UniProtKB/Swiss-Prot annotation:
Localization: Cytoplasm
Gene name in the database record: nadB
Designated name of the protein: L-aspartate oxidase
Pfam families in the cross-refs: FAD_binding_2, Succ_DH_flav_C
Cofactor note: Binds 1 FAD per subunit.
Cited function: Catalyzes the oxidation of L-aspartate to iminoaspartate, the first step in the de novo biosynthesis of NAD(+). Can use either oxygen or fumarate as electron acceptors, which allows the enzyme to be functional under aerobic and anaerobic conditions.
Length: 540
């Protein structure tokens, strides 16, 4: 039995960060758009991004330099075409953001002219990071949200989780296999609704919540990667999860990130005894790429048996620190730490998913009509390690590129008037919610211990056995009980955990963010780790 559609649009965008909202605004003058947000519309990784956006605005810088820096940080397996595509379109996409009203910091040059204040971060050979103090993501997100909420062709559905994608062949529709919409969990009504769309875009962010310690907000549960996999899309390079070197080590602020820009402006990493250690690991010192810095911190913590290392910028003038890092300064002061006077305790934490759903230059996946942009996707830009401040840039460039392709294809898109309703005829209300909570904590703990910064084959095998057991329990629970937010996220996280481990087991080398004691050397020839649904394989 089919039902009239509860929601219908030209384009359904799942996710409300920089990728999803920039795409929505580019499409909305010509198309009807629905944006799903799991929580409040501003909640997501974009809002919490501190550093900035990389683009060539300085006349002493060049696109070629941006490309080469990205390739070096990516440890030899970036897709050069993707890197050149993003770097060459960076300035125009950042300019679009400025045209929307985003205010980046400026300063007065010695000649009296005003220009953007550009910072330098790890891996960059030039100052090319546009920023809004130390809260760039907040400035970007609040500006885009304001524009989206006031656009007549954009509907934002808050507290709405995508349960799964609706694929044509799975509901008996003839013709080319394509996405026709999604089932959506309305958390306010506690019911699953149907949403038809001529095109669906995954802009759901990454999967760092699969780890016990993360800088990401709670919504980063790998939903888009898991849904795309279940829909039949390939994924790639999920073994490369970036651990940000400097998350605050404090019981009252476990998810708080200390931006790369602190080290870009001269902060040192120190042992508990006050000595620096980064020069022992890399000639670039504190400005080495994140994978090297995170491993160095992890090494020193384990070698010394220390709970944390320290980040120290107190040798810089206090006014300079307060001017450039006002949000961090106030946050730390509220926790009893004076950034201008003392070192800050830090630990690495899961931060960014460098792999994801395989896409082309326009964000197209393996399923007709389905796109993936931003952190959920694998474009080839990041390779084995993302360079600082390339993530928001990737959101903007592929938001633009996907909008061009969707608009070009929209006249030929299929339209339908009914979809099958969500079937709850054989499920009941859950009676043991503790099962979800227990499995949730178990998953995140063993992923941190076995599939973290340093790995071994035995640890990966042990993790995969645990994942298989959890999947059986969760699948049984999902089949018999009504859905909930925690169940949906756990189901997706366990699926992504499996994909991460399988990718990691395929890579018989240590490269970038994937470091294994069993294969500490680099292979001479390497490439992306690609998984295909129903036929796990590697393609190098």
């Amino acid at each position: 039995m089919n039902t009239l559609l509860e929601h219908s649009c030209d384009v359904l965008i799942i996710g409300s960060g920089a990728a999803g909202l920039s795409l929505a605004l580019r499409l909305a003058d010509q198309h009807q758009v629905i944006v799903l947000s799991k929580g409040p519309v501003t909640e997501g990784s974009t809002f919490y991004a501190q550093g900035g956006i990389a683009a060539v605005f300085d006349e002493t810088d060049s696109i070629d330099s941006h490309v080469e820096d990205t390739l070096i940080a990516g440890a030899g397996i970036c897709d050069r075409h993707a890197v050149e595509f993003v770097a060459s379109n960076a300035r125009s996409c950042v300019q679009w953001l400025i045209d929307q009203g985003v205010l980046f910091d400026t300063h007065i040059q010695p000649n009296g002219e005003e220009s953007y204040h550009l910072t330098r971060e790890g891996g960059h050979s030039h100052r090319r990071i546009l920023h809004a103090a130390d809260a760039t993501g907040r400035e970007v997100e609040t500006t885009l949200v304001s524009k989206a909420l006031n656009h007549p062709n954009i509907r934002v559905l808050e507290r709405s989780n995508a349960v799964d994608l609706i694929i044509s062949d799975k509901i008996g529709l003839p013709g080319t296999r394509r996405v026709v919409g999604a089932w959506v969990w309305n958390r306010n009504k506690e019911k699953v609704e149907t949403c038809h769309a001529k095109a669906v875009v995954l802009a759901t962010g990454g999967a760092s919540k699969v780890y016990q310690y993360t800088t990401n907000p709670d919504i980063s549960s790998g939903d888009g990667i898991a849904m795309a996999w279940r829909a039949g899309c390939r994924v790639a390079n999920l073994e490369f999860n970036q651990f940000h070197p400097t998350a605050l080590y404090h019981p009252q602020a476990r998810n708080f990130l200390l931006t790369e820009a602190l080290r870009g402006e001269g902060a040192y990493l120190k042992r508990p005894d006050g000595t620096r250690f980064m020069p022992d690991f890399d000639v670039r010192g504190e400005l080495a790429p994140r994978d090297i810095v995170a491993r160095a911190i992890d090494h020193e913590m384990k070698r010394l048996g220390a709970d944390c290392m320290f980040l120290d910028i107190s040798h810089k003038p206090a006014d300079f620190i307060r001017q450039h890092f006002p949000m961090i300064y106030e946050k730390l002061l509220g926790l009893g730490i004076d950034l201008t006077q003392e070192p800050v305790p830090i630990v690495p934490a899961a931060h960014y998913t460098c792999g994801g759903v395989m896409v082309d230059d326009h964000g197209r996946t393996d399923v007709e009509g389905l796109y993936a942009i931003g952190e959920v996707s694998y474009t080839g830009l990041h390779g084995a390690n993302r360079m600082a401040s390339n993530s928001l840039l990737e959101c903007l460039v592929y938001g633009w590129s996907a909008a061009e392709d969707i608009t070009r294809r929209m006249p030929y898109a299929h339209d339908i008037s009914t979809l099958p309703p969500w079937d709850e005829s054989r499920v009941e209300n859950p009676d043991e919610r503790v099962i979800i909570q227990h499995n949730w904590h178990e998953l995140r703990l063993f992923m941190w211990d076995y599939v973290g910064i340093v790995r071994t084959t035995k640890r990966l095998e042990r993790a995969l056995r645990r994942i298989t057991m959890l999947q059986q329990e969760i699948d049984e629970y999902y089949a018999h009980f009504r859905v909930s937010n925690n169940l949906l996220e756990l189901r997706n996280l366990v699926q992504v955990a499996e994909l991460i481990v399988r990718c990691a087991m395929m890579r018989k080398e240590s490269r970038g963010l994937h470091f294994t004691l069993d294969y500490p050397e680099l292979l001479t020839h390497s490439g992306p780790s690609i998984l295909s649904p129903g036929n796990h394989y590697i393609n190098r």
